[in-house]
C-alpha cells in the first residue's frame, strides 16, 4: 500500500510520500534511544506537564486546521474530526495533571516483609514503538503518546499508510509543544518495516491498535524478543436493550453508537440484541432513524455519515451484507454502495441473521447494524458472548438486578450501562479474548510501559537482607 493521502470522498490521490530509508530508520532509533537516556533523568514531571499542556494548547488553537486534514485523509465528518482534535488536547491535559500521582511510589507493609522500607517504584522502559490505525488518526496515537511521554518514555510512531499527514503533524505538534527533539518521532514506513524496528535492541516495547492479523504478527515478534506489548484489536460490540429501558433514548444512542466515525470504530456498537417484547418496535424506530441520516461530503456540516476510509473497506462490508442477504438475511435499509466517486456506503440494517453468516462471526467495519432477538436476559448474554471478540459492550436496562448481571457476565473489557462505549482519559481501555490484551488510558495506561520495580530496604543493622533463606 502506498504511503499517500487519498481523499476517500473522491478517490483522488492528493499527495504521496517517500518511505524512510533503512538508514533513516536506524538514525531515528538511535536518536530516540540517546534522547531517552537523557530524558528519563533530566526532566521532571513538572517540566513534562508544562510541555504536555503546551501541546494541548496548540491542538486546541489548530483544531479547525487539524480537523480538515483528518477529514481529507480518512473521510470522517468535519465535526467529528474537530472533536477528536479537542479530545487529544484533553488527553494531554489529563496526564499533565495526573501523571506524577499515578506513578507515585506505592508503599508496602515493610514490617511484613522484614524491611525498614518497601515500595513499588514505576520507571520508564525506554523507546516504545507505536503501530497505529487510520480510523482515529490522532486520538489513537495520543492515547499512547501522552502517558508514555509523561512517564519518561520516548516514542516512535509507525502510522497507517493512508494518514501520513496526520502522523507527521502529531510528531510536529509534540515537538512544538516543547518536548525535546527525538522524544516523539514519526517514521513513514510500510508495515514490512515493523519487524526490523521491533527487533532492534534499543526498542524496549510496542503498542499496536489494529487488525487481529497485525496484532498476531507484532505479538509474535515481541514474544520472540521478550518485549512487552499492548494490543487493542477488533471488536464486535453488543448493544443489548431490555424492556425496562428508555426505548426512545436507547434507539437514539444506538444509532449514534453504530454510525460514529462512519461506522469505523473498534468500539462502535455492531450487534443489537433486543428483548423480544420490544424487538419489533425498537427495530422499526432504529430503521427510521438510520434512513434519515444524511450521507455525503464529510466537509458539509449537515452530513451525518461520510465515506469509508478505503475502497477495500467499502467493498468488504458490501460483501458481508450481500452474502448474508443471499443466505436468507433480511435487508431493512441500505445495503448498496452509493453511485458516483468516493467510497460511500449507506447506513444499513440487517435482520434474520444466522450463525453461519459472516455478519454473525466477523467484525463489520462500517455503518451496518445487525439485529438479534432475545427471549430473555440469559439469551441476550449468550448472544453477546457468542463472538471471539471482547472489547466493549453496551446494555440498556433500568432494572438493578439486570444491570449487575450484565456487569458480571458480559465478556468484554468494558461494560457501559444505559450509554454507549466511549474512551475517556480517566478510564482504562482495552479488551479480552481476541480483542487484545493490556490497557490504555488512566493509571493502567501510563503504567503499561513502566517497570514496576520492587524496592526493599533493610535497616543498616539487619543481617537478614531480603529475608535471608526464606522460600521465594
Swiss-Prot record:
Q: Does the keyword NADP apply?
A: yes
> What SUPFAM superfamilies does the entry give?
ALDH-like (SSF53720)
For this protein, the parts annotated as crossing the membrane are none
Task: Give any single GO term for biological process.
Answer: tricarboxylic acid cycle
> Which superkingdom is the protein from?
Bacteria
**E.C. numbers:** 1.2.1.79
In the UniProt entry, which residues are flagged as the active site? Answer: 232 (proton acceptor), 266 (nucleophile)
Enzyme category, top tier: oxidoreductase
User: Which is one GO molecular function term here?
Assistant: succinate-semialdehyde dehydrogenase (NADP+) activity
The answer on whether this UniProt entry bears the keyword NADP reads yes
- What reaction does this enzyme carry out catalytically? succinate semialdehyde + NADP(+) + H2O = succinate + NADPH + 2 H(+)
Annotated keywords: NADP, Oxidoreductase, Tricarboxylic acid cycle
Binding of NADP(+), residues = 134-135, 158-161, 210-211, 233, 363
Summarizing the function annotation, the protein's role is:
Catalyzes the NADP(+)-dependent oxidation of succinate semialdehyde to succinate. It is believed to be the main source of succinate semialdehyde dehydrogenase activity in Mycobacterium.
Q: Which PANTHER family match?
A: SUCCINATE SEMIALDEHYDE DEHYDROGENASE [NAD(P)+] SAD
Family per record: Belongs to the aldehyde dehydrogenase family.
Q: Would you tell me the protein name for this molecule?
A: Succinate-semialdehyde dehydrogenase [NADP(+)]
Source organism per UniProt: Mycobacterium avium (strain 104)
Amino acid at each position: 500500500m502506498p504511503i499517500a493521502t487519498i481523499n476517500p470522498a473522491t478517490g483522488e490521490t492528493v499527495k504521496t510520500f517517500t518511505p524512510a530509508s533503512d538508514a533513516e530508520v536506524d538514525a531515528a532509533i538511535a536518536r530516540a534511544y540517546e534522547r531517552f537516556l537523557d530524558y528519563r533523568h533530566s526532566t521532571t514531571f513538572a517540566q513534562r506537564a508544562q510541555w504536555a499542556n503546551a501541546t494541548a494548547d496548540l491542538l486546541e488553537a489548530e483544531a479547525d486546521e487539524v480537523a480538515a486534514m483528518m477529514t481529507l485523509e480518512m473521510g470522517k465528518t468535519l465535526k467529528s474530526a474537530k472533536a477528536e482534535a479537542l479530545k487529544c488536547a484533553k488527553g494531554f491535559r489529563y496526564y499533565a495533571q495526573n501523571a506524577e500521582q499515578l506513578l507515585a511510589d506505592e508503599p508496602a507493609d515493610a514490617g511484613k516483609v522484614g524491611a525498614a522500607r518497601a515500595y513499588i517504584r514505576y520507571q520508564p522502559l525506554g523507546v516504545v514503538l507505536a503501530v497505529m490505525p487510520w480510523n482515529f488518526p490522532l486520538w489513537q496515537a495520543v492515547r499512547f503518546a501522552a502517558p508514555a511521554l509523561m512517564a519518561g518514555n520516548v516514542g516512535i510512531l509507525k502510522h497507517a499508510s493512508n494518514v501520513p499527514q496526520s502522523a507527521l503533524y502529531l510528531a510536529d505538534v509534540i515537538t512544538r509543544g516543547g518536548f525535546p527533539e527525538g522524544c516523539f518521532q514519526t517514521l513513514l514506513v510500510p508495515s514490512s518495516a515493523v519487524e526490523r524496528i521491533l527487533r532492534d535492541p534499543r526498542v524496549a516495547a510496542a503498542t499496536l491498535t489494529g487488525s487481529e492479523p497485525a496484532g498476531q504478527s507484532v505479538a509474535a515478534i515481541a514474544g520472540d524478543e521478550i518485549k512487552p506489548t499492548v494490543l487493542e484489536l477488533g471488536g464486535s460490540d453488543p448493544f443489548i436493550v431490555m424492556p425496562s429501558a428508555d426505548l426512545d433514548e436507547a434507539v437514539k444512542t444506538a444509532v449514534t453508537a453504530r454510525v460514529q466515525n462512519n461506522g469505523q470504530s473498534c468500539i462502535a456498537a455492531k450487534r443489537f440484541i433486543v428483548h423480544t417484547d420490544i424487538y419489533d418496535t425498537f427495530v422499526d424506530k432504529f430503521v427510521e432513524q438510520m434512513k434519515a441520516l444524511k450521507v455525503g461530503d464529510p466537509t458539509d456540516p449537515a452530513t451525518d455519515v461520510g465515506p469509508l476510509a478505503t475502497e477495500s473497506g467499502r467493498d468488504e462490508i458490501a460483501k458481508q451484507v450481500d452474502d448474508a442477504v443471499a443466505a436468507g438475511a433480511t435487508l431493512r435499509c441500505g445495503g448498496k454502495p452509493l453511485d458516483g466517486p468516493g467510497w460511500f456506503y449507506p447506513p444499513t440494517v440487517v435482520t434474520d441473521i444466522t450463525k453461519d453468516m459472516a455478519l454473525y462471526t466477523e467484525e463489520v467495519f462500517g455503518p451496518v447494524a445487525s439485529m438479534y432477538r432475545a427471549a430473555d436476559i440469559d439469551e441476550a448474554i449468550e448472544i453477546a458472548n457468542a463472538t471471539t471478540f471482547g472489547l466493549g459492550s453496551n446494555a440498556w436496562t433500568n432494572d438493578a438486578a439486570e444491570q449487575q448481571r450484565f456487569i458480571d457476565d458480559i465478556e468484554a473489557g468494558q461494560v457501559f450501562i444505559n450509554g454507549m462505549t466511549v474512551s475517556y482519559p480517566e478510564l482504562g481501555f482495552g479488551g479480552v479474548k481476541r480483542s487484545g490484551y493490556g490497557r490504555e488510558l488512566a493509571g493502567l495506561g501510563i503504567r503499561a510501559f513502566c517497570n514496576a520495580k520492587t524496592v526493599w530496604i533493610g535497616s543498616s543493622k539487619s543481617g537478614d537482607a531480603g529475608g535471608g533463606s526464606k522460600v521465594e
